[in-house]
Amino acid sequence: MKTSVLLVILGIAAITVQCTASESVKQDSLRTFVDAVLGWNAEMASEARCGGWMAKCADSDDCCETFHCTRFNVCGK
């Protein structure tokens, strides 16, 4: 009787570990997708701030480089 109870408990623990591991993989792929979308939005916002190749961005410390604003770059260098 004690052996069967122990086996049931070990089985439940194994299933729980497997489900938890499977869930974290799903969450990681969802997180990757969300990060990709948010990164794309940030890239689009950066392009919108640029006036053109190596132009000055709206922020005085920013400079356009390949139509993306980059922090602490000096235009023309």
From Swiss-Prot:
It is found in: Secreted. Keywords: Amidation, Disulfide bond, Ion channel impairing toxin, Knottin, Secreted, Signal, Toxin. Disulfide bonds join C50-C64, C57-C69, C63-C75. Residues 1-21 form the signal peptide. Coiled coil: none annotated. One of its GO terms (molecular function) is ion channel regulator activity. Belongs to the neurotoxin 10 (Hwtx-1) family. 65 (Jztx-21) subfamily. This is U14-theraphotoxin-Cg1a 2. Probable ion channel inhibitor. The presence of a 'disulfide through disulfide knot' structurally defines this protein as a knottin. It comes from Chilobrachys guangxiensis. Expressed by the venom gland. GO terms for cellular component: extracellular region. The modification Lysine amide is found at K77. Residues 22-49 form a propeptide.
